[in-house]
Amino acid sequence: MTTYALVGDVGGTNARLALCAVATGEILQAKTYSGLEYESLEDVIKQYLSEHQAKVTDACIAIACPITGDWVAMTNHTWAFSIAAMQQNLGLDHLEVINDFTAVSMAIPVLPAQDVLQFGGTQPQPGKPVAVYGAGTGLGVAHLVNVDRRWISLAGEGGHVDFAPNSEEEDQILAVLRQELGHVSAERVLSGPGLVNLYRAIVISDARLPEKLAPKDITARALADSCTDCRRALSLFCVIMGRFGGNLALNLSTFGGVYIAGGIVPRFMEFFKASGFRAAFEDKGRFKDFLQDIPVYMITHPQPGLLGAGAYLRQKLGYELSS
């Protein structure tokens, strides 16, 4: 068995590659490449291996799209490939290609304590189910269960479940967005574009015309307290994040914890801490007491996708992760 394996975390814009120490899971020599500068993912990998003069026989690549078979076609990029053909072309003995949130979920058992921030609840119960979700360009969701001392990630497209309002204000948001979009999924409000949808719906429901704002503009105005509509949108975003996380916790009784990943929330961490997130997480009527002890964590590790891809591969190779 080789000392190092190749791991990757590939999104619509960038491809992050690194080496993973197989024995320890340590991530080394990480580098980010622009996906726009290469014709294929295989070309990026060859470039990385050439630059680092690395010989590897095992690899795990996490990609932001559903993985349903040998043929992988990225949702937000032109790259498409056969897993078997790529494995052969790269001379690998073993190539795993997994969903990006499968990778993030697999990082949970190996996350250092200093790489998470807790938002309420008590201590996680070892070996109990875990939920992980995150808002970025879209809304990613996964669950994690421990079976016979092995962690199994339950991948899915949970971000596309129905948006379920639970207040008059949220009812108004749904009415506006339904008129525009037809089906309104959770991702339509819990993502970068979703924050824009919330802002627009708030303004339209008041019979006014919204400005053309980007997510960063809405966040900046909310934090500066210079726009009431933007502040309402960001506050509502935090509340709906809580409601959605509570739903995930109920699905599998996730006493192992609920983890938040993704690029949006860390940009307004102090606002998030003071928001209605935790109250909304527990706002489940007769099951409020059930949720009070379930801890919620924000992942602050800079590269959870790479860490999780390494953990996924190491477990496949026979290593036992923390329970």
Curated annotation (Swiss-Prot):
<dbReference type="GO" id="GO:0005524">
    <property type="term" value="F:ATP binding"/>
</dbReference>
<keyword id="KW-0067">ATP-binding</keyword>
<keyword id="KW-0808">Transferase</keyword>
<dbReference type="GO" id="GO:0006096">
    <property type="term" value="P:glycolytic process"/>
</dbReference>
<keyword id="KW-0324">Glycolysis</keyword>
<dbReference type="GO" id="GO:0004340">
    <property type="term" value="F:glucokinase activity"/>
</dbReference>
<feature type="binding site">
    <location>
        <begin position="8"/>
        <end position="13"/>
    </location>
    <ligand>
        <name>ATP</name>
    </ligand>
</feature>
<keyword id="KW-0418">Kinase</keyword>
<dbReference type="Pfam" id="PF02685">
    <property type="entry name" value="Glucokinase"/>
</dbReference>
<dbReference type="InterPro" id="IPR003836">
    <property type="entry name" value="Glucokinase"/>
</dbReference>
<dbReference type="InterPro" id="IPR043129">
    <property type="entry name" value="ATPase_NBD"/>
</dbReference>
<protein>
    <recommendedName>
        <fullName>Glucokinase</fullName>
        <ecNumber>2.7.1.2</ecNumber>
    </recommendedName>
</protein>
<dbReference type="InterPro" id="IPR050201">
    <property type="entry name" value="Bacterial_glucokinase"/>
</dbReference>
<dbReference type="GO" id="GO:0005536">
    <property type="term" value="F:D-glucose binding"/>
</dbReference>
<keyword id="KW-0963">Cytoplasm</keyword>
<comment type="similarity">
    <text>Belongs to the bacterial glucokinase family.</text>
</comment>
<keyword id="KW-0547">Nucleotide-binding</keyword>
<dbReference type="GO" id="GO:0005829">
    <property type="term" value="C:cytosol"/>
</dbReference>
